[in-house]
Amino acid sequence: MALGEDDILSVPFKYFVFCIGGLPSSALLICVLLSLFLHFDQATSTHCEVANWLPSISAAVSTYTPEKYIWRILIGLHIGPRLVVAVAFRNFLMSSPLRPYTGSKQFKFLCNIACGLNLLENFFLLALTSISSSEDHSLHAKCFGGFAISSIIYMILSTWLFSESGRRRATNLGERSYEYKILGASIFVVCFFLGGYLYWRHNTYCEPGIYTLFALVEYSAVLSNIFFHCTLYYDFHGKNIALTSSFGSSHYNLLPTQIEKDT
């Protein structure tokens, strides 16, 4: 990859997307499979001892080793790029040449709100990863609530801002990204409420297989969240993230190559 005159490092944006999508989805798959193979009885047990064949995400990623270490490492690694991407997407929306001039202050304000919600989502996810339900159930539950609420509001708001900015209509990729954002957000919202219902039903009636359905809905919610954020692949298609000098080369004076001796 060719670098500009003042570029020190240039990374294609698609690699950031692979990172924010590949690391958490791989972590989920690995942890669930390891839980099934190594700790099936413990990971799938329920408080009322009914039949269950899949571990919840909490049981799969935060209770047993090596699952909890794999989850924490991979989620921790992907948080950094997600923070960068959160700010980059804010700037992407605000710099659109097609955004409306009327209400520009309100538009910028909402872009900042969306960016803040995205950052909050990541911090709540990091807290969820660091503090398991077995260590502090109350704090873990609060972090989950914060993650879910900030995720839902961010998905809805950022999708609307993407359309309002004009980026949706700029290219065919923009339209595809918009459609995928709606799909990912819709699945996440449906899974959130369906998961809540199944969890309530399991705790109320203790029916066989209901907790398995709850686990499947949990997996779907996580994957739809990842899918939503991976739509950035289309938004930043062909772009790079570069580390560059804030001064042009013209600001540097070359040292002399020879030193003349006084005679």
Curated annotation (Swiss-Prot):
Transmembrane segment boundaries: 16-36, 69-89, 109-129, 143-163, 180-200, 208-228
UniProt KW keywords: Endoplasmic reticulum, Golgi apparatus, GPI-anchor biosynthesis, Membrane, Transmembrane, Transmembrane helix
GO CC terms in record: endoplasmic reticulum membrane; Golgi membrane
Primary localisation category: Golgi
Pfam families for this protein: Frag1 (PF10277)
Compartments (UniProt record): Golgi apparatus membrane; Endoplasmic reticulum membrane
Domain of life: Eukaryota
Recorded family membership: Belongs to the PGAP2 family.
Protein name: Post-GPI attachment to proteins factor 2
